[in-house]
Curated annotation (Swiss-Prot):
PANTHER family: FACILITATED GLUCOSE TRANSPORTER PROTEIN 1, SOLUTE CARRIER FAMILY 2. Residues 1-22 are annotated as: Disordered. This is Glucose transporter 2C. The keyword Cytoplasm does not apply. SUPFAM superfamilies: MFS general substrate transporter (SSF103473). Residues 1-43, 141-152, 197-214, 272-300 are cytoplasmic. It comes from Trypanosoma brucei brucei. One of its GO terms (cellular component) is membrane. Belongs to the major facilitator superfamily. Sugar transporter (TC 2.A.1.1) family.
Length: 337
């Protein structure tokens, strides 16, 4: 009987463990709780802005090709509306180019060289943000150490707003190099974003939700790319070639999405709570509390750095950026409308 009592007396202990764990689990915040959304918002805004900026190039190039293809516009009103893109209404009652077409062109259309950007300009435009992102990712670590995550978000927000303003200026003046300057500046900001968004979540998300919050950045990058593509489809298919096509308005409307996301990034930085982890050094460069940025030497970080570089390099070698930037041209050359 004593043996039985001992067995029974141990039963509550066996039951208490799981109950305690369940109780602890119940006290953790839900995914849609304000506590978790306050952390996850950086992934949502940062990922969407990053994705939209990736999808920006293909749509902008497509719209520019439409705006500079003067032969598409069938009336005087429509032709005059795209006069800033090199079109004019001729005495022959057709909309054509102000510049003389290349009579030595090997293409079917001798004015083909006047439609859209040249191969060189398209390459510069497509690579501008990539160059900026490379610079931004390099300086991100120093930026975080100097300013912390919260101020880094604010700085990125300001840079993104300025870059978006340059996009609108480029549309108004039809200045290619202003557009490229905006893309480089946006790239620098996004290079930092790709570092600070996952880092903020890693440091502040509840352990139960850290993995779910962690994947949101990539999810919303994909959403941003899809958003840009859907807007491009709508803007392209709704052009009225018989009346005022309002191409400048379409460019401004498309760029306005980037502007809204940039302002959202700035506001996120302004109202974001400070990270629970901080980097702190005294005047001699030694840690005086918080996390020590010199805790690990280069030798210890070499393998993780190598793995990160190989993973990122493999992703780029798939050609995803080339496909995203030149998707309309690729499908056009394949005979797909």
């Amino acid at each position: 009987m004593t043996e039985r009592r001992d067995n029974v007396s141990h039963a509550p202990d066996a039951i208490e463990g799981p109950n305690d764990g369940a109780h602890a689990e119940d006290t953790s915040p839900g995914f849609f709780s304000l506590e978790n959304l306050g952390v996850a918002q950086v992934q949502v805004v940062g990922g969407t802005l990053n994705g939209f900026s990736i999808g920006f190039v293909a749509v902008y190039i497509l719209l520019y090709e439409v705006a500079t293809n003067c032969s598409l516009f069938k009336t005087t009103e429509a032709c005059k509306a795209v006069g800033s893109y090199g079109c004019e209404w001729k005495d022959t009652e057709v909309c054509s180019w102000k510049k003389e077409c290349d009579s030595d062109s090997d293409g079917v259309n001798p004015c083909e060289s006047l439609i859209g950007y040249s191969s060189l300009y398209s390459g510069i435009f497509a690579s501008a943000m990539i160059v900026g992102s490379m610079v931004g990712s390099i300086i991100a670590g120093k930026c975080i150490t100097m300013f912390g995550l919260k101020k880094s978000f604010i700085i990125v927000g300001v840079m993104s707003v300025v870059a978006s303003a340059l996009n609108h200026i480029s549309v108004a003046t039809n200045e290619f190099w202003v557009l490229c300057a905006g893309r480089v500046l946006m790239g620098i900001g996004l290079g930092v974003v790709c570092v600070i968004c996952p880092m903020y979540v890693n440091e502040n998300a509840h352990p139960k939700l850290s993995k779910v919050d962690g994947v949101l950045f990539q999810v919303f990058i994909t959403f941003g790319i899809m958003l840009a593509a859907m807007l491009g489809l709508i803007l392209d298919k709704t052009v009225n070639y018989d009346n005022d096509p309002d191409m400048a308005g379409r460019f401004h409307g498309f760029c306005a999405v980037s502007s809204v996301l940039s302002v959202a990034m700035f506001l996120v930085g302004m109202f974001l709570r400070e990270s629970t982890a901080t980097f702190s050094q005294d005047d001699d460069g030694k840690a005086d509390g918080g996390m020590d940025p010199n805790e690990y030497g280069w030798g210890q970080m070499l393998w993780p750095l190598f793995m990160g570089a190989v993973t990122a390099g493999t992703l780029q070698l798939t050609g995803i950026n080339a496909v995203m930037n030149y998707a309309p041209k690729i499908t056009e050359n394949l005979g797909m409308d």
